[in-house]
Amino acid sequence: MGMLKIGKNCSVCKEWQEHCYWSHMADHSKHFLKHMVGDFTESMTVPARFANNFNGHISEEVNLRSPSGETWSIGVANSDAGELVLQPGWKEFVDGNGIEEGDCLLFRYSGVSSSFDVLIFDPSGCEKASPHFVGSHGFGRAENSAGAEQGGRNGRRTPPIVDGDNGHRHHLEMTLHRNSCRSIPRACKRSLFSDETEAKENDGEDEDVVAAAEGGRYGEYYFSRHGRVAEYNLREEDREEISRVPVPVQPGNPVFVQVIHSSHVRSSKYCIVGVSPEFAGKYLGAVEREVVLERASRGGEWHVPFVHRQNTRGFYGAGWRQFAGDNRLVAHDVCLFELTMVDAAASGGGNRRRRWSRRPTMTVHVLRRVRGRFVLLR
């Protein structure tokens, strides 16, 4: 009788635990595991129990973020058996991350708009190294591996961004394991430096084109003009829709609108998130300074350098990468940078003018397209 009673109680406890897990635990604490076997390269089925409990949270398109920070948009289809299947774009994700038969993928739901962080393990159960370096030659991403930016045990650190190719190259060359005799192979080193320089130049060119012309305005919204990368350009109807989204912007605060490029969230690349000359000139001035970014819905603040050069104005560096990573930004997100303004008495008169207090502070509101329309992320 005692054993039966214990068994019954355990069953009730398990049901209660299941309910608490799916209904009350934070979404970003939920995971599922998939072994890559059979014909895994063309599609992947989401476990039924996970899919059923996330009904309404998984949209027609999901974003998969690999360990490198690269993000893939994957289409979601329904099978004849009623299962959710990742299909359009899945093959590109598999090929891009070198996923092989026998590998195991751990998916962690990020809690926002059908986005998952993915860890990739080999058949031995060890995490694979190569997915950490997608889009690089294997060294830039290492600076953001476990413990690196927090002064981990291996003694590595994130090299600061240095103006000029020579300073940037010097810091990259010195990024070695303190207790290791291995160094970067010469051929890879040449490729790495050329890639970093090319990324710096290309990103700058794209941002200059985006920000060079006067941005379109809707009320206090400043929109960037079209750039060279067509997929990141906002159409007129997009701007109108964004202007209608009920974003909690304080009256009188100017807002700059920027579409996030893949290079803006790729931590292994040097890039600048461009700000239009009109907005920068009117509100931020021609001085390089630190800007504080905040998220009203999440709390916390991030200190991000604002650079002002001859052809480029915008955010850059480790501060921006930290902000993008902590807030799980993905390519094609739309960020609304709301500059917090206060009233100040104009010198020599009773009129009042609007300015930012102490240092520039911006509240960032993030929009993401879900099922064909822009929604505000919390």
Curated annotation (Swiss-Prot):
Q: Does the keyword Protein transport apply?
A: no
Q: What is its main location?
A: nucleus
Matching CDD domains: B3_DNA (cd10017)
- Molecular function in Gene Ontology: DNA binding
Q: Name one GO cellular component term.
A: nucleus
Q: Which residues bind DNA?
A: 29-124, 256-370
Checking Gene3D superfamilies in the record gives: DNA-binding pseudobarrel domain (2.40.330.10)
Q: Which Pfam families match?
A: B3
The record's subcellular location field reads: Nucleus
Q: Which InterPro entries match?
A: B3_DNA-bd (IPR003340), DNA-bd_pseudobarrel_sf (IPR015300), REM16-like (IPR044837)
Q: Where is this region: Disordered?
A: 140-159
Give all cystine bridges in this chain.
none
**Coiled-coil boundaries:** none
Q: Which UniProt keywords apply?
A: DNA-binding, Nucleus, Repeat, Transcription, Transcription regulation
Q: Which domain of life is it from?
A: Eukaryota
Q: What protein name does the entry list?
A: B3 domain-containing protein Os03g0622200
Organism, as annotated: Oryza sativa subsp. japonica
